[in-house]
UniProtKB/Swiss-Prot annotation:
Gene it is expressed from: lipB
UniProt-annotated location(s): Cytoplasm
Residue ranges, annotated region (Disordered): 1-27
EC number: 2.3.1.181
UniProt keyword list: Acyltransferase, Cytoplasm, Transferase
GO cellular component: cytoplasm
Name of the featured protein: Octanoyltransferase
Length: 255
């Protein structure tokens, strides 16, 4: 999923004029986060659904996290440079989207989590939301003995040390519309990394991209996804809320 100059998030320039009087107003209480497991879903379907969800929000709409795995697709942020797609005939579709950031790849074996969060109701600055998302990813990787860090000016999460020092393992890009976020993050678990060779990941030529498996982690997609959901809830609503998550919220059956 910072101010307008930060590549993490793309604010809606028309938000101050296009919002209806009800859009994302601040009710007194924070509503619980709903977790939805969408299985393998085409990117376009999720893109359309999260925009529609955000446009239809009212002060009573609860926040949601959508967890999904996409078929192969490249996505290019709204200020992205198409030149960062190095192989035009790769066979992987390219979708231009309205998030911040440049080009990235989504595919099988990668967790994608979309964060549909009412920042106004939570009284959150965008930079604070980004920091909490990043921290959730760092904590998730740490649960599998993988040390990772942020990089100033380079959205995403990177390997801290070892043979793959500095390689990217997670990506982040948000859109803010009427005080509410959509888009989110991706974590590479165990995937075919070759499609990343056809792009400059997030606009950085020669940037190595890795997954958890190539770093020695053997956890499967669903296990890592459950860990990520817990850490996202903990960083958004606190450890008590994460501990109180019903089992159904951690099962791939409520899509």
């Amino acid at each position: 999923m910072p101010p307008a100059s930060d590549a993490h998030a793309a604010p809606d320039a028309a938000a101050s004029t296009s919002a209806s009087p009800q859009s994302c107003a601040a009710p007194p209480d924070t509503l619980p986060v709903t977790v939805r497991w969408l299985g393998e879903t085409p990117y376009d379907a999720c893109f359309d659904a999260m925009r529609a969800f955000t446009d239809a929000r009212t002060p009573d709409t609860g926040d949601e996290i959508w967890v999904v795995e996409h078929p192969p697709v490249y996505t290019l942020g709204q200020a992205g440079n198409p030149a960062h797609l190095l192989v035009a005939d790769s066979g992987v579709p390219l979708v231009k989207v309205d998030r911040g950031g440049q080009i990235t790849y989504h595919g099988p074996g990668q967790i994608v989590a979309y964060l549909l969060i009412d920042l106004r109701r939570r009284k959150l600055m965008v930079r604070t939301l980004v920091t909490r998302i990043e921290q959730a990813v760092i904590e998730t990787l740490a649960a599998y003995n993988l040390a990772s860090v942020r990089k100033a000016g380079a959205p995403g999460i990177y390997v801290e040390s070892g043979p793959h020092h500095g390689a990217k393992i997670a990506a982040l890009g948000l859109k803010i519309r009427n005080g509410c976020s959509y888009h989110g993050l991706s974590v590479n678990v165990k995937m075919d990394l070759r499609p990343f060779l056809a792009i400059n990941p997030c606009g950085y030529a020669g940037l190595e991209t890795v997954d958890m498996a190539s770093l020695g982690a053997t956890a499967d997609w669903h296990e890592v996804a459950r860990t990520l959901v817990r850490r996202l809830i903990a960083n958004l609503d606190g450890a008590t809320a994460a501990a109180a998550l019903p089992q159904q919220a951690l099962e791939q059956s409520n899509d």
